[in-house]
């Protein structure tokens, strides 16, 4: 569904390259391919081997770099970031990469995808020790930990600092002479490494490699730190306490269909989810349609499995200005009609299966069901290609309270009545794992299922949780 309307948003995307004369330009194109991961801000920091130069701003990547600013960022290495704010707010000071300059130790740039669940505790400790924070972003915590580390080399300072962090993080760190890549011990966020000639490329999604012409090498492993400089790439471990738990929503919703995560194509996974959904809850109907864009693959899979024709029953308007999209519920509801239209010629007089990837608040689903009925659909059967999202996420998705999750307090039947569908079905957790290609009976399935099951792969600290949801979360 539409991220801006739906209220289900990912924090950001990161891209980095080392060893190319046009590193900032390539980073620009890489970030453009990751724009779906964040639209509130973008930035690029580059190094020429002696100094770091940067430009960043609020808005889309094309808005931030529109008046020749890109030509001012020069170097053979660069890291970039597109942001959706889930921690710290969306102000300019929080736009990444964050750049820290020191007369004694040189400069350091940080780009981060994820969310640190112990950031509040660490920040308080650092402030008690005299650290002064310039932003409200949890990313800045790492910079202060590095600065205060007692280790001699930057590599050891970073490894020591990373060992103190809890939560989800895919970090790109750049100095004048090297780029360092790190992924949390659970591997909650995707991060891949590739090659572009002799240059090393790192990105949140493999679709960025295709756009810039890079060749995929492998995934960055959980607990792994890569040190990339003019001498090549070296891999080290900063944690041996590994428990791979890739966010399931990356397959269901966030990532582009042409990306691969852990060797699994996102489009194929979503199509399989639709097939599993058909196995679990088929219904008699005349036409299947998907809510664009992220649900189309699942809808195709559902149609193939049931033999019901797939049709383009909903159209997305791609030219609604971003300034319209606001976080208020009233504008979010009105936004559905501006962003989506039902195709009367497809759905009129038909029993329609509407496939969507998830339900968060239920508001958008209700509006779309109403839209289909107004276009003449005689029945609307809603099929969701994921289990009910009943628990908050603290790892970088903008769902931090139970109150904003309708499945947290409503049964499936109550949700069906709320959205006005004839029937409503969610995919089971078992169906989700099988669709992605994981073993359901595996004690470590490789996926984070916390928003469905309430079982979090890391400790959840009290200050991470808003007071009115502490008790519910901390007892899981």
From Swiss-Prot:
Cofactor note: Binds 1 Mg(2+) ion per subunit. Binds 1 [4Fe-4S] cluster per subunit. The [4Fe-4S] cluster requires a potential lower than -600 mV for reduction.
UniProt-listed InterPro entries: GATase_2_dom, Ntn_hydrolases_N, PRibTrfase_dom, PRTase-like, PurF, PurF_N
Active-site residues, Swiss-Prot/TrEMBL: 12
Gene Ontology biological-process annotations: 'de novo' IMP biosynthetic process; purine nucleobase biosynthetic process; purine nucleotide biosynthetic process
Free-text activity regulation comment from the record: Allosterically regulated; subject to end product regulation by purine nucleotides.
Cofactor: Mg(2+); [4Fe-4S] cluster
Reactions catalysed, as given in the entry: 5-phospho-beta-D-ribosylamine + L-glutamate + diphosphate = 5-phospho-alpha-D-ribose 1-diphosphate + L-glutamine + H2O
Residues binding Mg(2+), per UniProt: 294, 356-357
Prosegment location in residue numbers: 1-11
Effect of residue 394 to V: Partial loss of activity
Subunit structure: Homotetramer.
Protein name: Amidophosphoribosyltransferase
